[in-house]
């Protein structure tokens, strides 16, 4: 068992799903996978695992191909989404490699059967992997077009009985407006699912937020760029926004 297992009871969130965008893997680039950036994320995941957390991941594919963008350029949407799902498998395999280089046992499960390179998605097997301290990366969304990786992440978080869905982003939470465009924007400490949907705050797509609301699983939005931020979220500290049924006024 991990060396931090004795500290597990201090964690606010013990079993979590971490959602990363494909773009996050680009680092400072315009396309593809930046290995040093992946290594930074992997170190944060390894640190969280050592603290006793059980972690699964969903990674988008936008750094390689976005189905919506392909459809906008004239491709059939279902075909474009299938390409996007394949991009998420590439990202999952890259992250698996980086994690295993750090000594973190990792399994990739795909919603599309690719037996030569990863496991098929089997819910009970994924649960068992996590119980044994392995990191599980869910790839290929839910295996169907017209569903985003945000929705796939929400579904997997529910199926894995996660305590929270953690969304690692480029900003440190949810703001009243885009802080890059509006200097008066303020960050919410807590906010209700319904307010996210009503104000269309663009944290995740509406289907994902609705799934989280209906199953009463909190979403925590935080910046992965800050050292130790993932561990801080697991302990319920640091800078972030928590989305719950009740919500709260912004600070």
UniProtKB/Swiss-Prot annotation:
Name the record gives this protein: Uridylate kinase
Alphabetized GO MF terms: ATP binding; UMP kinase activity
Activity regulation summary: Inhibited by UTP.
SUPFAM superfamilies in alphabetical order: Carbamate kinase-like (SSF53633)
Family, as annotated: Belongs to the UMP kinase family.
Pfam family, one: AA_kinase
GO cellular component, one term: cytosol
Summary of subunit composition and partner proteins: Homohexamer.
Stated role: Catalyzes the reversible phosphorylation of UMP to UDP.
